Amino acid sequence: MINGDIILFALMVVTGVNLARYLTALRSLIYIMREAHPLLYQQVDGNGFFTTHGNVTKQVRLYHYLKSKEYHHHHDEVFTGKCDRVRELFVLSVSLTGVTLLAAFLL
């Protein structure tokens, strides 16, 4: 029989891998954003986004931009595709984190 600790460990590994995928896609989105949408790049503090002194308010601006799908009106297909990917990976990472936390409390 499969032990509960093994299930929890497997969920944690899958969540960690998907979180790494999300952060990598977010980093590449910010890199593409520099050329495709310079105004948004400045609004979300593109240079300091992943630093320890990053402005959380500006990071939330990117979250709302992706949540409301404002990027659908953009002319660059690479940028809109990357925004879709980051949005999907964010939803997947948050849901996997929730499932992992639920499993940790139940097991």
Curated annotation (Swiss-Prot):
The gene is uspB. Belongs to the universal stress protein B family. GO terms for cellular component: plasma membrane. It is a multi-pass membrane protein. It comes from Vibrio vulnificus (strain YJ016). The chain crosses the membrane at residues 6-26, 86-106. Keywords: Cell inner membrane, Cell membrane, Membrane, Transmembrane, Transmembrane helix. It is found in: Cell inner membrane. This is Universal stress protein B homolog. The keyword Transferase does not apply. InterPro entries: Universal_stress_protein_B. It holds the Pfam family UspB.
